[in-house]
Structure formats: C-alpha cells, structure tokens
Amino acid sequence: MALWPSVFLLGLLPLLGRGADQIQTSSGKNTLEGQLWPESLKTFPFPCDPKTLAESVPSESVHSLRPSDIKFVAAIGNVETAPDSGADDLEEQDGTEKRPEQACMGVVTVLSDIIGRFSPSALMPLCPETRLVPRGGAEDLWMQATELVRSMRENPQLDFEHDWKLINVFFSNTSQCFPCPSAQQKGLVLGGMDKLTRTLDYLQQEVPKAFVNLVDLSELAAFSRWRQGAQLSPAAEPCRCLRETSQLTKVLTQWSYLEAWDSLLASSKYNTQESFAVVFQPFFYESSLSALLAEPPLQDPTTLALSLWNRMMEPIGRKEEPFSEKERKPLRCPTQESPYLFTYRNSGQLTRVSQPQGKLEVREGTEIRCPDKDPSDSVPTSVHRLKPADIKVIGAMGDSLTAGNGAGSQPGNILDVLTQYRGLSWSVGGDQNISTVTTLANILREFNPSLQGFSVGTGRETTSQAFFNQAVAGARADGLIPQAQRLVALMKNDTRINFQEDWKIITVFIGGNDLCDFCNDPVRYSPQNFTDNIGTALDILHAEIPRAFVNLVKVLEISKLRELYQETKVSCPRMILRSLCPCVLKFDDNSTEIASLIETIKEYQERTQQLIDSGRYDTRDDFTVVLQPFFEKVNMPKTQDGLPDNSFFAPDCFHFSSKAHAHAASALWNNMLEPVGQKTTHNDFEGAVNITCPNQVWPFLSTYKNSVQGFGTWLPCRDRSPSASPPTSVHALRPADIQVVAALGDSLTAGIGIGSKPNDLSDGTTQYRGLSYSSGGDGSLDNVTTLPNILRQFNSNLMGFAVGTGDASGTNAFFNQAVPGAKARDLMSQVQTLVQRMKDDHRVNFQEDWKVITVQIGASDLCDYCTDSNLYSAANFYDHLRDALDALHREVPRALVNLVDFMNPSVTRQVFLGNPDKCPVQQASALCNCVLSPRENSYELARLEALAQAYQSSLRELVESGRYDTREDFSVVLQPFFHSIQLPVLQDGRLDTSFFAPDCVHPNQKFHSQLSRALWRNMLEPLGGKTDALDLTAAITLTCPTQNEPFLRTFRNSDYTYPSRPAVENWGSDFLCTAWNASRGVPNSVHELQPGDIKVVAALGDSLTLAMGARPSNSSDPPMFWRGLSWSIGGDGALETHTTLPNILKKFNPSILGFSTGTLEGTMGLNVAVQGARAQDMPAQARDLVERMRNSPEIDLEKDWKLVTLFVGGNDLCHFCENPEGSSEGEYVQHIQQALDVLYEELPRTFVNVVEVMELAGLHQDQGGRCATLLAAQSHCTCFKYSQSSVEMQELKKVNWNLQSGLSRLSYSHQYVQREDFAVVVQPFFQNTLVPLNGRGDTDLTFFSDDCFHFSERGHAEMAIALWNNMLEPVGHKTTSNNFTYSRTKLKCPSPDSPYLYTLRNSRLLPDQAEADPTVLYWAVPVAAGAGLLIGILAMVAGRGMRCRPREDPPLSLSTGL
C-alpha cells in the first residue's frame, strides 16, 4: 500500500506528552539510584529479575555487554513535534524552542530508568543542548555529537574511559524518498551511511566503551507532523511513488532496506572492535489508515523508549516485527542464554534470508488424454450446454494470487515477489503449454488451441501481456468493481474476439487481503460488504457480457497460513508475512481475534454461497456464475519431516509458487466438471496434479441448472407444431400457439420456499419465481418442471416466464406479478400492472399474441379472515375476484385464463400441526394465524372450513356464470386439480414433509413439480372430466394433445354446458358472527352501545319504509305495504329467510321490540312511516313515535336503548320536478332537524340512523322495457318523463346532491353531541347509488317492485345489509355506495376490538365533551368528518372504476358497472 502521510501519524513518537513535560535535565542527585519509576511507567509491569542476570565484573567486550554494565545513556538527533500551526505569537514560538531537548530527554530518561533497574548506579541521561541555529542534516548531527562528547568528558560522575555508555543516534532518510519501491536499496543505504559516517567515525574515535543504537525514524519523519532536525539532507518534495506503492511493495521494500543496513553494518569497521559497536534499530509500523483517521496519535515518549528497548533484546535478523500503534508490547528481558545486548557478532548467523538460493524451481506440467476434445456440433446458445472446446476466450479478476506475484521467483529472492508472473497464473496464465505449465488456460488450450485472453510473461494488469487477466496485486473485494469495468471495456474493444458470439470463461477469486485486514476495519471488511462488492462486480459482468461462464472461487481458508508462520524450523521472512497479513498472524491461537477470523472466513464462504444460490445470475440462458469451492478447506502441505512445505510458496511464504499454481489450476478444472452440490471442497496440495476428463455422457461444464435433474420431466409428445395459421378463437388454441405466459396470485405463485434448503427458515422470504409451477422458467424441462418449461417444448420463443429470484417489480419476474401475502382484494392491482407491462413490452404483440394467464388466490385471505371477518367475507372474495377477472376480460385480447383453486386449509393444518418437531409451531401465528391457530373441533375451525367452501363456490360460480365466455378470443377455465390433495404418509404414520418448504406451509420444488404436471393435465382434460384431486406421490405423466383433440380445453370444445344455478328460495342471510352477547351491564353511553344492548327499534319515512310493493300482487289490486319485510323495521320470519335490520338484531337480542310484521296496520309496531311523506312530515312522525313509545307498557322509556332509522327524500325530489320554485334544500334539512330535535328532547338512550336520500335519477336510469313506460307514467313523480340528458334531469341531480350534503352535516351539529345517551349518525350507503346489473350487464329488475319505482323484497334485503354494515363502519370511513349483488354472507360482524355501533366520538373524530370547546366542536368536526367522507368516496370510485358526481358540476349520467 502507499505510504500516505496520515498513515504514519503513529503513537510511538509524539514525545511532548505528560512524561516529557516532567523531565528535568539536571537535579540535585546525578544518579538514578533511589529514583522513582517514572510517572509514565508507574502502571507498567517490570517482569525482569536483575539479580539473576547481574555480574560482579563489568564486561570488557561490547559483544557481551549486559544492561547492568551500562552507566550512562545519551542521545543525539532531534526527536520533536513540529510547532503548532496556531502558535503565531512570539511567546508560543519561544516555548517550542525547548521541545527538541525535552523530547530527547523523554526517551532517554525512560531508557535510563529501565537500565537503572539492572544498574542502580547509572547516571542521569543526557541530551546535549542545542543553542545554535540548526543547519540541517548531517551537520547538525555532528555538532550534537561533539557537544555530547564534551559533556561526557566534563561529567565528574562518569568515568569516561572505563564506564559503558549507551548512545542513541536518531536519524531519518526522508530526503531519499524512502521507501519508494526499488530493488537497489543498497544504494539508498550507502547514501545514508555516507551522511552518518562523520558522526559515527567521531564517536568511534572519541568515545571508548560505547554501544550505539542507530535508530531509523524514516517512516515517521517522512509523513508525520514531526520535524526531524537530524534528517540526512534538506527535505525534498514528496515523491510520487508514495501514492502508488502497494502494501506488498512497501513490505518488501522495508525488508530489503533493513537487510541492506544490516549487511552493511555487519561488515563495517564499526563492528570490528571490542569496545565499540553500532547496531541498526529499525522502526517499521503496522498501521490502519482508518484507525488513525478516527483517533489522534498518542502523545507518550514511553512508547518509543519501550519499543527501542525491546528491539535491543532481539537478535540481528529477527528485528522484524512491525510496531503497532494499537498495542503496547510487554517489556522484554535478557535471557539466561543471551543476557547481553545483541550485536552483529553475538547474534550468530543472520536468520534473515538475504540472497537468492538454489535454482529456479522446476515447473510442474501434466498431460491430458481425454477422448473427446471436440466442440459442440453447433455453437451452443445455452451456458448449460457448454463443452470445454466451446470456450474461445478466457479472463480473470482478483488479487496478487491471480496476478501471479512471485510464482516464478527463485527461492530466497524475496524482492522478486514484486514481479507478477501472469503467464504462470493458475486461472488464466498461458506460458508455454500444459506439458510444462499447468494452468486453466493451458488445459483449455488442449481443447481449443485458438483460445484467446490468457496472460503471458510478466507485468502489471495494464501491460499487453496481461491480456484479459485484470487482477490487481493487493486488491480487495471492492477492487473487483473497477476490474470488471476494465475487463468489459477490453473485451468490447479487442478485435481478436467476437464479443457477442464467443463463449467466455472468467474466473473471479478474491478475499485474502480482506481477511488480512479484517481486524483493523471490521466494518469495511464485513461479510456483508465483502459479498455486496462481489455482487456488484458480478452484476457488471452479468449486465455487460454475453455468453459467459463465470467461476467464483470461494475464499481461501487463509487461517492455515499460521502453521507456516509459527514453525520456526522453516525459513520464512516473518516480518513480511506478519506485515502482509497481520489479522491472521499476529494473534495467539486461542485468542478471540482468531476465533473471530475463523468465523469471518466461514461467513465469507457462506454469504458467497447464498449470493450465487439466489439465482441472481441465472436469469439469462447465456450467462451463469458457478461457485467453485475447492479452496473451502485447505490443509497446509507438509514435507516428509512433517514440516510445512514452503516449496508451495513464493520466497515471501505468502504467495503461491508455480507448484501451488499448478495444483490450484487442476483443482479449479475438476471443480468445473463436478455437478453442483457434489463439488470437491477440499484441496490436497500434496497429491499429484490430476486432470479429470469431461463425462462422455454429460460433457458439459456443470452449472446450477444442468446439475439438477431430479425435478425434470419427460414430454413424450411428438406433434408439437402450432396451428397452420394463428387461431382467432380461444376454443381452437394449441399449446404451440401460446406465445406469452403470465401469473397472478400470492406467495405460492411468487415462489416462496420453493428452493429453500431443508431447515433453512431464514430463507423464508426468498421468492423463487423461476421455479414457480405456473410461471417459472428456470432451467429447462429436463431438470425443472413448470408450465412454461412444458410450453417451451412446443414453442421455444415463449415469453413472460419468470426466472431466478426477486419480487414482482424486478425484471426477473417478467409477467409473474404474484405478490407474497396477496389477498383477493390485491388482484385488481396485479391485473393493472400485468396489463401495463404487456402493453409496454416491445417483445410482446399485445393484440395478436395468445396468452395463458394463471390465477390462484385465496389462501392468504383465509390466513387472515379471523382478524376481520367482514373484510375477508365470501362476498368480498367473490367481488374482488370478479373485478379482477372482469378487468382481464375487458383489457386483454387473446387470452386463456386458468383459474386454479387454492390449497385447502385442512392440508396446511395436517402438515404443520402433525409435525411439531420439524415445523416452526412457534411461528404459526405469523405464518397463517387463522388457519393454524384454531383448535380441533372448535367453532373457529368450523367457520374456517365453511368460509373455504364458500370461497371455492365463488370460483365455480364466477366461471359457470358464463360472463367470461362472451368473446371468441377469451375464456376462463376452472382447473380443479388442487381441490383435493392426498398427502403422503411415512411408514411410521407421520405425514411426509419433504414436499414442503421449511415453514411447512409453502410447497417446495418437489411439490411444485407435481403441481405443474397436474395443471398441464387439467388443461388438456375436457370440462366435466377434469381431475379434481392430486396425489403428491403419484407418477403423473405429461399427457399430449391428440390428433382428434389437439386444443387446450374450454367449455365449448369440451361440448360442455354449465350447470344451471338453483333458484333462490329466499333473500335471507347467513349469520357468521361469534360475539352475540350484549354488554355486561347496560351501558350509560351511546358511544359504548353494542348491538345486543338494543331493546327497541323504530322507523320514520315514506313508502320505502312501508315496503310498498315488496312482493308481487294482482295488478288490479291496490299496492300492499309489506311492513314485515321492510329493510329498517320489518320483523317477519328470521334472518335466514328475511334480511331486515330487526332480524339481524334478533341474533343479538331475541327480545327486541318495535319491529313490524305482516301487512296490517295493527302489526305495524313502531313503524310510523306514511306513504307519500316528505321531509316536512318528519316532525309529526317523530312526535307520533314518541307518543307510541310513551304509551307502550312493554317499553321502559328511560332505560331501554332505542334504535330509530329515518329515511326520507324521494318524494321531496319528485316534488321538485313538479314545482322547482317551491322546493328548497334548506327547508328539507330544517324539517329533518326539527324531527331530530323532537327525538333529542323526548327520547333518552337513543341511537338515530339518518339514511341519506338515494340518487333518484341514477338508480332508475336505463331500466328500459316495461319500466321505461311505467316510470314515465308515474303520476306522483313526474321526474321520469324527462330524459337523462335533459336540463331538468341535470337540475334534479344537483338538488339530489345538495340534499345529501346538507343531511351529512346534521350528525356533526353541536346540539346532538351534548348528551351522553343520544347520537345521530348519517349512514351514507346511498350517496353513490349504483344500478344493480344482471349477468348480461342490464339493469336487474328483480331488485324493484312491479311499479319499477319501489324496492322488491330482494332490494329491501340489500338495503338492510347496507344499513347494518354502515352502522359497523367508523364515521368518515363508511361505505358510500350500495353493493346490490347476491350473497348470503355479506353481513359484517362487530369487531372484537371495537364491538360498538359507530358514532362520531368512538370513531375518534370527536374529542371528549368535557375537554372540548363547543364552538370548536361545531366547526372543526364537520371539516374533519367531511374530509374523511370525501376520501371514502374517492376510494370507492377509484376501486370500482365508477364516476361519482362532483358537488360543483354533476355529470350527465352515472356509470352502471358494479
């Protein structure tokens, strides 16, 4: 790495810390005896025992000099910090002039203190004062030396001739641009030595008995904030190489620099005497750039002194351990074997390998004797059918192992490791041939001699010899991204290859350098970042390079390098090893750091596995990435003596030699031929190089898709031809005519869990769309059975299938728009997205291409139905599914829609609850609460099963309605294979979970394969003869179209008639609510009123409340009032046969009073409605009602809770048509308010429903036929004689809307919120009145009475349902349109969390009265509620595609679609 300035702001030499400030250059006592251990060392342990090492007689030779022999310590050379940039005033500048002396003294005092433990009589240390103006470099150093000698001579305590002295000479070589990469470090050292010679000569000549430490501070001086006065020459400008030098270059240069100094000094005149020696003490630093940027350097002189002392305790040749700014090493002690300070003479033979030894290692070749070396008969289009001889181009990305650093270096020639022997690189080198050099490229050249892209010779990645070997020495995972970009550009621009057509193999190997630095920056080198960087680089290759097979080699188990580092019997430059890979080598075996390293290696390997297993790079048929795991487990090769065999390594013992490159190449090749899941993960370097031949039966390079054969299926069909010309009818559609596939649905169709490994619950969110039974297109039918893969056997140009993994928005999804967790209500959104995608995709001819769309929904609805039984009711399920299919029918031409049943919840329960030891029972509520949580034989379970049956009935009813068979080019076919599933049972009687994902809820690939076969079989079976059961263990063969029946089956080509729907016997409803009880005590507040608390019902209104004409009558008879069937007050029969509001309330309180029965006035109960009544009649009806209640002996007026429904306005609108000038919207509201005032003043404990007037014109428009005549002839309502487009009708619509608007404001009137036991709530279900339609799209007259104006019994039932559901909806969120479609299950249930009838207050639109200002109430609440009302209207309009009438300018007509 480059020697950036910030890197070397280390903590060992900032000597102006607290210790330096306390040092005195003189004292009253000039010896260290009795002095306290210095402040900076008080807490530092002193482990040495001076008594065991002491000698009574001082040594006569410097080569046997013990610490106890030393009497005096001194130093020359400036060791100081630069003045602060902020020290501008003279006072501050004067302070800095003393810093050199203080800094020097800070170091030598600590050294003296250490020596004082061995030699109590040692004198106080000395740094000569410098009062002269510095002249720089060698001159200053010499002047300090002369001053030092003078001071020592004049010191009366020092016996200058006989006492041993320790002199430290601090210098730096910064002017020499140290340490720029150079193989000629000797020249640099000689230059430095020349500058030091005068000083060293002087000391040797003048100072007897001296041990001189030559302390090199070059790295620090060059780039820190320190100002070194003892630089050997004036500072020069920093050289450019400092920014370009790699970590490897820096380390090797440090080593060679150290070796050069030692070699020079060992043979110099300074080490020939007995009384004088000079020893080079190096300081090379292990540093983390990120750490130094984050923290300021330590300001402690002790650090340098301790490190220098420890260096003195190391033999020459072993002073290799770099200094770490993060940790302070313990103080080292002299040993019994070596109790002296080390010199070049007493260190013995230098252990550092300094010169090349031996001859160039013999390179290992091999031979290939494969019988089949031929390419494919034609150039393959699929990467999964790629033979070795089909490869025409080779490339590689990575670090120095791929660059080939040191691969061809002679043993001992450490500096030559800087040479990148790319031609020998295991994955891409092409030197010579396979007989002499074993590399992947040379192996492939045996199959295709014309291979291009391999590297030859030596050089960096920028040289022409590198070709497509773009590995960069020192690269980490984040360096792969620029490498990928460079490789793509080179390939695109190289005229020797055909970029689009040539098949390429690219090998990616990275991670060693990331692991080596992991401990210094765990965030940068985290497993997540490592994988993300690899993913980004692979994304570039995937996006840019066609026809490519990418090898991603798992990261090397680099921790095994510790064996080589720790074995001292093996000659290796440990300084280099440790510097290159500190995080692997510098910690103890049982340390937490090593445990973390091993775990990180494992995570690197696992995350890369997950990245590739995701299918992210298997989205194209001409590209794949295959993980090659042969480096996952590596044993250190050993010699016959059992020692680590360094012949497999370059001279630095870190990089591979050509021998290791050969073994790696053969291991990679063999991995490439081994099936995924069966690849060798252990590489034995000690064995012979072995080259495997491709299997003659299966000669392809193994990929994820061609390695999995277990889920494939054989298609026996011989006739796979399309129609002679594209069919125009869906009933004449052959499989080969299908050009587009698509799918809608939930997690099953999205592919959740299909490809998950057993027991891997963490993979529960991956959407394996490429394996989805109805829309997946991964692999081929040979190994992945899906409907698209079957159809591709008939039409290889099929479009729309999903591949790989990802969500619905990704390109991999294509036309699989299923969304995990989707409910029926989400289908419409999926349809809209699908239609838009089809229209926008240029590959699809939207109008002409035939499409198969598979729809499956319902399971997720059942999973959540118990949370909101209203939202997930069968009626809503039917409506949502119908709306989605209607949209497909309306928008998509030439389509066959498969409507597939959902998996019965009983199946899920059996599997999940029957295997508690395998299934995550604790997660049942999260996975599918309403299906998995109910107990056996419980009411909740029975309700679930009933709802599931209702859902299934909805599927059949929709298809059999024939509404989707009105066009020749569109049909919906129910495929019932999922209706009944036979689960496999193991021999011990337990259910076989091998067909399910780890969550035991979703089917896995084994299950999906069976679903695909069953779906295909259903599509070829005629209606009326379709298989409606699935045996998961059955051998389902793929059937074929026959000559007589070559088409996909529809109702018409099956000669099938849908069964007629049974006649509806009554208009009752099924009651599915569970909480039927009233409140525990009679509530005092209307805002806590539950349905079971209601004791009395009553109604005000006109002939609609009287149920006039609800049942047919003789045309000659006057119309009858069927009060007992009235929607808001009728009580005939029971809810199961007659749906009315009182019959609903009877389910909660069978003793309810006030409802009407029959047709006579005597049984009218509290129904005070009057035929022809208008708003002006409401106050009188209110008074009549109050009087009847007072006079009823059954009613406790004060205590009984009452429910009053007021509905009027139709006659007011009719009156407007007769006399526009005589009608006023204000009067209408005023009359209603007067009636409410009466109720408010007279009735305690009352809940009032005010139902908004219906849209009169919209409800009766386009009735046609006899109704057109009857309505026009209405004498009491002349509105219908006008056309819908007339001015009169437009005015009527305005008035209609104004009446609704005025009425909605009543419930916010301040006077009706003052009492705790009274509430007025406007129920707006008629606000947007929708015309009910029949199956043909015409107005359904069965909702109307014989006069076409009033409602029939069916219409009354629908009004009752709408009113009840409105009452259970919060104010501001109420349904504002009627849904007049038949279903017995549309009634909502009170929510367990909020079981009350909704009022303004419990809808949280009204603050407590005690806290609210009435004036604020009156204005603020209507605004808030109005906004909520508007939102509700807009949501309804958007969801149903309806056009609602704006308040300002009503449209000419209403949409009549449901």
Swiss-Prot record:
Residues exposed to the Cytoplasmic side: 1437-1458
Protein's membrane topology: Single-pass type I membrane protein
Catalytic residue list: S400, D514, H655
Keywords, alphabetical: Cell membrane, Glycoprotein, Hydrolase, Lipid metabolism, Membrane, Phospholipid metabolism, Repeat, Signal, Transmembrane, Transmembrane helix
Region described as 4 X 308-326 AA approximate repeats: 39-1403
Gene Ontology cellular component list: apical plasma membrane
Sequence repeat placement: 39-347, 362-707, 708-1054, 1064-1403
Tissues of expression: Intestine.
Transmembrane spans: 1416-1436
Sugar-bearing residue positions: N173, N433, N493, N529, N590, N690, N783, N1077, N1114, N1379
Chloroplast in keyword set: no
GO terms, biological process: diacylglycerol catabolic process; monoacylglycerol catabolic process; phosphatidylcholine catabolic process
Described purpose of this protein according to its UniProt entry: Calcium-independent membrane-associated phospholipase that catalyzes complete diacylation of phospholipids by hydrolyzing both sn-1 and sn-2 fatty acyl chains attached to the glycerol backbone (phospholipase B activity). Has dual phospholipase and lysophospholipase activities toward diacylphospholipids. Preferentially cleaves sn-2 ester bonds over sn-1 bonds. Acts as a lipase toward glycerolipid substrates. Hydrolyzes fatty acyl chains of diacylglycerols with preference for the sn-2 position and of triacylglycerols with not positional selectivity.
Name of the protein: Phospholipase B1, membrane-associated
